[in-house]
């Protein structure tokens, strides 16, 4: 098969209408707007109502991305959903396929937590580069508000809900300029949404485990230390593959985890603050949704323009981290 180029040709995003401000959180746990904002940069986050689903948010973001790419749902060959919070543990991508009417698309979920969008981007690119598919819909979406302990101020202040999507298409020139992916399972315990089973005897001498999950747990100091060290390193590696220098980057688009992490990574790469995209204050950490959500907002606001070079990096549970360098548009 002939190797093809890749272009990201459309973007979209969707968030729940319900907002929860820092001041309101102080009614739940011992905290304050000043405490949260100075440590995280977050001022509010969006929360999905009980009647809202991950698939509905993802489908709304996808419709925008498909429209902005100038194609229809019937043109989509593959749907990749990066999520850790599916509607159904068996998979939610097929549910989105049905909602969109993307009848010819293969659809499956991919789980890499907050790195999910970057891992999904690289995965989607391989299907296009090898000529298997022409049009891929990549979605990052999470509803972590359903999986946090709302009495734990170390985690409940951080997370919000949302979805973002992009369309990748085969292109005469390759706009994915470089990438690098890494994993380290020895540090898995620093950030978990872990299985928590309850032993149950269903017959004499026959025991099974009734499955459920415990709320998100995190060692914030270790996650910060990991991100501050590993993210600049992997962006440098992706830049080397792209044969570019830091000075050639137009925008730094990181997973929106914590403003201190964004600032530290930018400083270590010598990237000025005006090149750093951040919407963390309005949405909090939306996990796999954070990069495509921030990307779509920046495109719609006119910040990101055709041919701009973007360095993006996702990092989080696993531990996993990755970076990709791409040019916006065809």
From Swiss-Prot:
It is found in: Cytoplasm. Its EC number is 2.3.1.180. It is an enzyme of class 2 (transferase). The active site is at residues 114, 255, 285. It comes from the Bacteria. Keywords: Acyltransferase, Cytoplasm, Fatty acid biosynthesis, Fatty acid metabolism, Lipid biosynthesis, Lipid metabolism, Multifunctional enzyme, Transferase. Residues 256-260 are annotated as: ACP-binding. GO terms for molecular function: 3-oxoacyl-[acyl-carrier-protein] synthase activity; beta-ketoacyl-acyl-carrier-protein synthase III activity. GO terms for biological process: fatty acid biosynthetic process. It catalyses: malonyl-[ACP] + acetyl-CoA + H(+) = 3-oxobutanoyl-[ACP] + CO2 + CoA. CDD domains: KAS_III. Pathway: Lipid metabolism; fatty acid biosynthesis. SUPFAM superfamilies: Thiolase-like. InterPro entries: ACP_syn_III_C, ACP_syn_III_N, FabH, Thiolase-like. One of its GO terms (cellular component) is cytoplasm. The last Arg residue of the ACP-binding site is essential for the weak association between ACP/AcpP and FabH. Homodimer. Belongs to the thiolase-like superfamily. FabH family. Catalyzes the condensation reaction of fatty acid synthesis by the addition to an acyl acceptor of two carbons from malonyl-ACP. Catalyzes the first condensation reaction which initiates fatty acid synthesis and may therefore play a role in governing the total rate of fatty acid production. Possesses both acetoacetyl-ACP synthase and acetyl transacylase activities. Its substrate specificity determines the biosynthesis of branched-chain and/or straight-chain of fatty acids. This is Beta-ketoacyl-[acyl-carrier-protein] synthase III. It comes from Nostoc sp. (strain PCC 7120 / SAG 25.82 / UTEX 2576). The gene is fabH.
